[in-house]
């Protein structure tokens, strides 16, 4: 097993419903440690930059609009196989397809407002972490 870091966003819908603590509890219960976290209200420019890979997709405008509609929690998680573990905790992108007990099954209303984002690979995690956090903001959890 590999100790990894992954990136997570608690999206505006879940923040508005006060699900931050419950979502963080799921991460920690599953053995992931929070090594950085902050609440931010994304600007249009910041959201467009983060989701640039989707800029040609038909849902891009709606995605940016949603992600700028309220504050989000950006978080760095650390643990054994953190990327895969976080994706399992989140569940399928479409909450209608998500297994019971996953974050999206429990907290998401639709595929468009699906509560959480998580990196899909170690490489994208590193890129996404660097987009929101400086190295000195990441706190090693040795205890």
Swiss-Prot record:
Q: Where does ATP bind?
A: 11, 59, 87, 93, 104, 114
Class in the EC hierarchy, top level:
transferase
Q: RNA-binding as a keyword?
A: no
| UniProt EC number | 2.7.4.6
Q: Give a single Pfam family match.
A: NDK
Q: Which residues form the active site?
A: 117
Q: How does it assemble?
A: Homotetramer.
According to UniProt, the name of this protein is Nucleoside diphosphate kinase
Annotated organism of origin: Pseudoalteromonas translucida (strain TAC 125)
């Amino acid at each position: 097993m590999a100790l990894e870091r992954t990136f997570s966003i608690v999206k505006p819908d879940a923040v508005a419903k006060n699900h931050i603590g419950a979502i963080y509890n799921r991460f920690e219960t599953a053995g992931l440690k929070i090594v950085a976290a902050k609440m931010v209200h994304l600007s249009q420019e910041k959201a467009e930059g983060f989701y640039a890979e989707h800029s040609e997709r038909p849902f891009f405008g709606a995605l940016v609009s949603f992600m700028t509609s309220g504050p989000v929690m950006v978080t760095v998680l650390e643990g054994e196989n953190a990327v895969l573990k976080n994706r399992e905790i989140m569940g399928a992108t479409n909450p209608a397809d998500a297994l019971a007990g996953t974050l999206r099954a429990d907290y998401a209303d639709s595929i468009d407002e699906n509560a959480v984002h998580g990196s899909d690979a170690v490489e994208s995690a590193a890129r996404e972490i660097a987009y929101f956090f400086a190295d000195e903001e990441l706190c090693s959890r040795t205890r």
